[in-house]
């Protein structure tokens, strides 16, 4: 078997730092919330050039929370791409909304030339999924979101550090949702 990632080699390099950080969290009794979360949120949002950063359990939770914050639910439709993982769709369904799927372009990302055909009066949001370190064509997505007054929630689970025209993943739409997948 060919390993894609040899995490043991990386772990050995970082072992002392990892164990020290875990030990500090447990000694301080701040496993949930606390100064390490505050530090992470600050550093993560600064890196992505965003005003806020809120740590949650995973990208599914982040997308669900974002959709609910925009009052998206039963009877609403959310457009995403057909080439996504189950968690993206799970987040949409968790709100009671229906997912509508736009096909992909030659780069395996949302085909923005087909996007407008899926927008109707029930559409409330677009969830573009940035994949493989590549970002969707955000100019067109943002143009359509303004035209139809839609929210844009970027699924950035596989695009940490990616950029589109100098802007980082998660910093273009209304909300960017990440994971450490």
Where are these regions (language model features)?
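Conserved active-site segment immediately N-terminal to the catalytic lysine
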Residues: 154-181
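Phosphate-binding glycine-rich loop
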Residues: 30-77, 91-95, 101, 167
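N-terminal "arm"/small-domain region of PLP-dependent enzymes with the aminotransferase-like
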Residues: 1-30, 35
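PLP-dependent aminotransferase-like
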Residues: 68-156, 163
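Structured loop/turn residues at beta-strand edges in well-structured enzyme cores
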Residues: 20, 48, 73, 121, ...
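Generic hydrophobic alpha-helical segments
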Residues: 40, 63-66, 115, 141, ...
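PLP-dependent aminotransferase class I/II
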Residues: 8, 20, 35-43, 47-53, ...
């Amino acid at each position: 078997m060919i390993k894609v990632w040899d995490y043991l080699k990386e772990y050995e390099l970082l072992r002392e730092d990892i164990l020290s950080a875990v030990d500090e969290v447990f000694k301080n009794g701040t496993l949930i919330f606390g100064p390490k979360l505050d530090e992470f949120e600050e550093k993560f949002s600064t890196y992505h050039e965003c005003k806020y950063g809120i740590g949650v359990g995973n990208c599914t939770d982040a997308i669900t929370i974002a959709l609910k914050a925009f009052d998206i639910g039963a009877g609403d439709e959310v457009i995403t791409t057909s080439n996504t993982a189950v968690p993206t769709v799970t987040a949409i369904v968790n709100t009671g909304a229906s997912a509508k799927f736009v096909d992909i372009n030659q780069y395996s990302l949302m085909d923005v030339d087909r996007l407008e055909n899926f927008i109707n009066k029930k559409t409330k949001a677009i969830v573009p999924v940035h994949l493989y370190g590549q970002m969707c064509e955000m100019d067109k997505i943002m143009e359509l979101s303004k035209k139809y007054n839609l929210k844009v929630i970027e699924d950035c689970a596989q695009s940490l550090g990616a950029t589109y025209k100098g802007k980082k993943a998660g910093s273009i739409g209304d909300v960017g949702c990440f994971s450490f997948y």
